[in-house]
Amino acid sequence: MVSLSSVGITSALNQMRTDIKTSTQTSSNGYEIQWMLEYGNDPRTDARYEGPQPIGDSDNDGKNELLISGRDCTIRVMKWNENQQTYQQVRALRPPFYPFIHCSAGGMAIGDVTNDGKNEVAATWYTTVYRYIAFKYWIIGLNPYIFKNNGGSADCLIGDCDNDGKNELILSGGPGWESNSSVAEITVFRWNGLFLKKVSEWKDPDVNGYVYMAGLGDVDEDGENEIVCAYENKVIVLNWDAQNKVFVPTQIYKTYGQVSPFGVVCKDCDNDGNAEILLSYDGPRITIFKWNGTGYPMQFDITWPGGDPVIEGIDVGDADNDGANEVCAGAGVTHILQWNESTYVEEATLPTFGWMAVVCIGDCDNDGKNEINAGNVDVNIDSGELFTEWVFKYVPET
């Protein structure tokens, strides 16, 4: 175990920011702002970053926490305080060797990396894993392979990508600014009981691509998970070949005239029990692909004229707690769409703004109902916009 622990942030830091604890605005159809925090207007430190799995039980106490990241060398662990009816920062995770090393977590995730039935927190910086032990988050493992080889790691997620019943830590990224880097678009690590070991990768033989965010799920309905990633204007489904220990790629789409997709989500958005593939673009645009038995035709495609880039601000989940999943996508304002058996129709919008790098659905306040976490990575500073993180809650009319 590396003897580096989390660093507490005092209340003085929170006093330097605007923390709105209760609902002050209502968007369409019953969604209220449960909480928001305005970080400031400095893009070097205040911009918010995405993590595909930021809501979960990170300290194994039976209650969920919310992770918030950004360009400030910090992952904030937020916990709902029922008495004060607000989210409070209970811990702050720093990169290894901080303050001698300054870097930001482009992605973070909560899940069982070590396959012992307890959750850890994973972060992209140095491919680091934290475990909550004795009232602190301790670094139990890291693997600097990506950084050592002049690569970048934009995001990470935890799940079983080789279908052996055990989780891996999946890093998306690539060569970064170093075109001669050996770092792959997808790099997979596994906890071997002592440390994180690099066990597999997907390196495109034709291009040096960069994957901002990958998705994981059973998108071809064969009972096994696939990784979906997008780079260099193409979308790839990666099937693990267990016999040859390699990923087998299938290109499902070419994004002509579009910047490569930023966000990728593999979840059931039409409520038929099977995962679809959702992509978000600079556009601002999202597309949805659905397996038909032989391929992945496009099920849905929408662009919001005049909207801001969606970036990684896309997720699927039961946002209004009606038993059916919705699609949430941030294109300046955040759009909430639901399948009506023929297409996706807009149910509501949320009053967000800027380039949305964060849109995640989960139970943040531990009441058994989902909330929507949102945050922006770029704003119009000249017009007075601030980098902001929100939590929205659906409150049905009585």
Predicted feature residues:
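Secretory targeting signatures
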Residues: 1-27, 264
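A short beta-strand motif characteristic of beta-propeller blades
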Residues: 33-44, 88-99, 141-148, 197-204, ...
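Beta-strand-rich domains and repeat architectures in extracellular enzymes and scaffolds
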Residues: 39-71
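Beta-propeller blade termini
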Residues: 50-58, 105-113, 154-161, 212-219, ...
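Acidic/hydrophobic-patterned starts of short beta strands in beta-sheet-rich repeat architectures
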Residues: 60-69, 115-124, 163-172, 221-229, ...
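Short glycine/acidic-enriched loop and turn motifs that connect beta-strands
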Residues: 72-74, 126-130, 174-180, 234-235, ...
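WD40 beta-propeller blade core
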Residues: 76, 128-130, 187, 236, ...
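Blade-level signature of beta-propeller repeat domains, shared across WD40, Kelch, NHL, RCC1
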Residues: 357-398
